[in-house]
């Protein structure tokens, strides 16, 4: 009788272990290896870099500095509102990631912060920037400031930007120098910069941007941090 009981108990324990392992495999957050991330254009720094103090403004007019990065994973894109292609595309991808997270793990969603830093401050007012950034997600922030203040941040995260006159404007026969001076675009790095919850530059994601890659990268980093 005791042998039968022992056998039944062992079977029960075995089945329980199998069930637990199955449940864990189902609910385990998918993660990417460093090699997988690199193959998808995601580059994580061997040692995250501290970011020195800087001061910009968010679209509500509030000060935005290093402390605003702390406590969350920030995925930051540098662009401008009238950018015709890469900016709206990349921000739309970040918006998709945010919605996916919102429909899943609430804690993961809360720790995700999408930010657009406008490097076109001459044209992008805070109100315009706010309307643009929040169109992709009401939780997103638009941030900007004078060029010298922007450079204090961009140089620390390997982002470059420059005002470039439009070739079409330069060939126009016009005496309207004011209009000519205003005819420009802004060339800028297309990476999405990753800032970790300590406010350190953690890595970057190269173009083209993909929602699934960004979501899996975020889940991986958050789980390992």
In which residue ranges do the predicted regions lie?
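N-terminal targeting signals for export/organelle localization
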Residues: 1-53, 225
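Short loop/turn microsegments at loop-to-beta-strand junctions
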Residues: 51-52, 74, 189-191
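Hydrophobic beta-strand positions
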Residues: 55-56, 194
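Short active-site neighborhood of thiol/selenol oxidoreductases, capturing the structured segment around
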Residues: 64-94
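Structural microenvironment flanking redox-active thiols in thiol-disulfide oxidoreductases
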Residues: 91-155
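Short, internal strand/loop/helix patches
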Residues: 130-189
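Thiol-/selenol-based redox modules, centered on thioredoxin-like
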Residues: 167-225
